[in-house]
Regions:
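Active-site cavity-forming subdomains of large catalytic enzyme subunits
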Residues: 88-106, 127, 131-134, 146, ...
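Short, solvent-exposed turn/loop segments enriched in Gly/Ser/Thr/Pro and often Arg
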Residues: 75-80, 89, 152-160, 592-593
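Aromatic- and acidic-residue-enriched carbohydrate-binding clefts of CAZyme catalytic domains
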Residues: 101-120
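Active/ligand-binding-proximal structured segments within catalytic/core domains
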Residues: 46-47
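Conserved beta-strand positions
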Residues: 151-152, 561
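Intrinsic-disorder/low-complexity accessory segments
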Residues: 1-41, 50-69, 118, 124-125, ...
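Carboxylate/His-rich catalytic cores and anion/metal-binding grooves
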Residues: 51-54, 68-91, 96
Length: 670
């Protein structure tokens, strides 16, 4: 029956979140998602049994639950990772199942099945929504706004089973207290079901509810109840554990049990949960109306693309976004129409908006399972003002597209392109790929009262492989494709270095190798691969560490070593050192710098701070050490803008995200 009227059920459910439907005489909506980490496979395997049970059972209890519940069912949140893991586990399976944890079956090859195709942790993408899998999932979430969302995971083999709530002191302050109370009440259903089958479990430990970019926490800021399940992992078919032999079927049974207990809780608590969601959005609007300012504005007058990409994220979350009606200067910061956006606070998603834009510096707890800061305009290095007024807002966007670049004006002399635009690297690569010569400005200059900053790209017309007309048409096409403005100039005379000066240096075509494989963090490698491959469309060779000893490194102008983990072998130092001597550019990220320093490729001085506390109780030691870590925080750093690494950044400071305690002393010549 519900399927026959599914549209009207959905419309009524959403109408209630808008305050247009009062009462709880309607179905509850439950989103059940499984195995967003692909190698945590018990969830996805349990989902098939759960789906079968719901489809085949004629039990009165099941039929009553189905009549009162709409279930959004996502059996595999990460099909790429699940496929990698299942292939590995089944390929290495013994006929006589071997529980020895040293067996190859339980030790995946790099990068493992946890991540998706581009090696992203998709359970950190609920807020930024950068991946295609996430975008479809988030669209479904906002189209339905479920009352409960479950997120089925696995944890260490020697654990048991976890369900939320998590550690109380690590719940985000914007999450309502009632949310956690309802989570705990739902937990009694899980406890009862697991008691019945004799499975051990725990709650209110290990995990937190702070970062809203995770599947179990994202619902909490959207009027839903997010619930994390963590099952001890067999990481294959059968494995020894501190609790005895752990089999894959046992892990599946626990996940299935939690899935069923969720539906039972939803059915019995239906009226409570529907009323909670109604009140959540009603309270949101009341809080938004009490704000002393009515809007938020953000943007960057020098880079419309970065501003657009933040607006794009907001709109994927069904947040209303307006254009800026005209150029504005607020608190000394310039906001340009077409490169800035206005967000009204008076909308039902105000709590989510606040979570995205707030800067929080005080916390109840100093320990975090995940990051503690994610202010989105800071992540994009944008100017923003949370105390703006809706009077500066123009029309609301129904759909949003990346701003169109200005037309290229024809020049018989030269063309200039700013390096501040997000897509400038993509445009430059298009130019160099066509074997067109380009140079980079090492100093600022001015032409006809227009200022050009460090890093401006110069494309001279003379001595190119295209005629003047063909070059103009080509650059016009590049500008339209990349949305980067390219300007023609008629003279090389400037205030500053003239265009023929040695302060313009030739840019060579990059040929990039990205080191991947054992000893490299898949997350960091995947982030770089994704950026170059999908955003900038710059070819990149993924060079496995196992190939380094025999690969012809002379093919590459640039080698990137992402963050290392574990032991990154010193055996590769000699060929890389010789390659650097021959003019190669080596880029090392985070603790790859230690490898660079250790192998004398570059002298790096690391700053260390020793812990001087004494008298730490044994039970406190783990938390004491954990409190010294940086799980993810935002810092402001001073920049020396004349350094090529900082070209394209308009200010002499920048906001950076840190998730490590690696600190490097300033260069002695700085």
């Amino acid at each position: 029956e519900n399927h026959q009227k599914i549209k009207s059920i959905q419309q009524n459910h959403i109408a209630a979140t808008n305050g247009k439907v009062i009462g709880v005489d309607r179905p509850i909506v439950v989103y059940q998602g499984f195995s967003i980490h692909g190698n945590e496979a018990s969830g996805s395997n349990a989902s098939l049994l759960l789906a079968y049970h719901l489809a085949a059972s004629n039990a009165k209890e099941t039929l009553e639950q189905l009549d009162a519940t709409v279930i959004l069912f996502d059996p595999s949140l990460n099909p790429d990772g699940l496929q990698r893991f299942s292939y590995w586990a089944n390929t290495n399976k013994n006929i006589l199942l071997n529980p020895d944890p040293n067996d190859r079956e339980y030790n995946e090859v790099w990068p493992g099945g946890r991540t998706n195709h581009y090696w992203f942790d998709m359970n950190r993408d609920w807020l930024p929504v950068q991946l295609p899998e996430s975008r479809v999932r988030i669209k479904t979430f906002h189209n339905w706004l479920p009352n409960i969302l479950t997120d089925h995971h696995e944890m260490g083999t020697n654990a048991t089973f976890f369900f939320q709530p998590g550690i109380p002191s690590r719940t985000h302050p914007l999450t309502p207290v009632l949310n956690q109370q309802l989570t705990e009440q739902i937990g009694t259903y899980h406890a009862s079901a697991l008691d019945e089958i004799g499975s051990l479990y725990y709650s209110k430990e290990s995990y937190d509810d702070f970062y809203y970019g995770k599947g179990s926490t994202f619902p909490d800021i959207n009027g839903s109840i997010g619930i994390l399940f963590e099952q001890a992992s067999s990481r294959g078919h059968i494995q020894e554990s501190a609790n005895g032999i752990l089999t894959f079927p046992f892990t599946i049974r626990n996940q299935l049990t939690a899935g069923l207990s969720t539906l039972k809780a939803a059915y019995n608590m239906r009226e409570q949960l529907l009323q909670y969601q109604y009140d959540f959005f009603k309270d949101n609007l009341q809080k938004a109306q009490k704000e002393r300012a009515s809007a938020i504005v953000f943007g960057d007058a020098t880079d419309a693309a970065r501003s657009y990409h933040l607006a794009e994220i907001l709109m994927r979350h069904n947040i209303k976004v307006h254009e800026l009606s005209s150029d504005q200067t607020l608190e000394g910061k310039a906001y340009k129409k077409g490169a800035a956006y206005v967000v009204p606070k008076n909308q039902k998603n105000w709590a989510l908006i606040k979570a995205m834009f707030e800067t929080r510096t005080q916390f109840q707890d100093s320990l975090f399972y995940d990051i503690s800061a994610w202010t989105l305009p800071m992540a994009f290095n944008l100017d923003y003002d949370t105390n703006a007024n809706m009077q500066i807002a123009g029309n609301q966007f129904k759909a949003i597209t990346i701003p169109v670049s200005q037309d290229v004006n024809y020049s018989p002399y030269a063309y200039l392109m700013s390096w501040s635009d997000y897509y400038s690297p993509k445009a430059l690569h298009e130019i160099l790929s066509a074997e067109i010569r380009a140079k980079v400005a090492m100093k600022p200059f001015t032409i006809k009262n227009k200022q050009y900053d460090y890093g401006t790209i110069l494309i001279p017309v003379q001595n190119q492989n295209k005629s003047k007309k063909a070059l103009y048409e080509f650059l016009q096409n590049v500008s339209q494709k990349t949305h980067v403005t390219i300007q023609g100039v008629s003279s090389g005379l400037t205030q500053g270095p003239d265009l023929g000066s040695n302060n313009f240096r030739t840019v060579r075509m990059p040929k990039i190798a990205l080191i991947v494989g054992n000893g490299i963090s898949p997350y960091d490698a995947g982030e770089l691969w994704h950026l170059l491959d999908t955003r900038y469309e710059i070819p990149v060779t993924k060079l496995d560490v196992a190939q380094l000893g025999r690969a012809d490194l002379s093919r590459y102008t640039t080698i990137i070593i992402p963050k290392t983990r574990g032991r990154f072998s010193d055996d590769f130092a000699t060929p890389i050192k010789e390659w650097v001597k021959d003019g190669g550019t080596l880029i090392a990220y985070q603790n790859a710098l230690r490898w660079v320093d250790k192998n004398n490729l570059m002298e790096v001085e690391f700053e260390q701070e020793s812990l001087t506390a004494t008298g730490i109780r044994f039970e406190q030691r783990r938390n004491f050490v954990g409190a010294q870590g940086i799980g993810g925080a935002i810092f402001e750093v001073a920049l020396e803008r004349s350094h090529p690494v900082n070209f394209g950044i308009k200010n002499d400071y920048m906001l950076v995200f840190r998730n490590n305690t690696l600190f490097v002393a300033a260069d002695k010549n700085s």
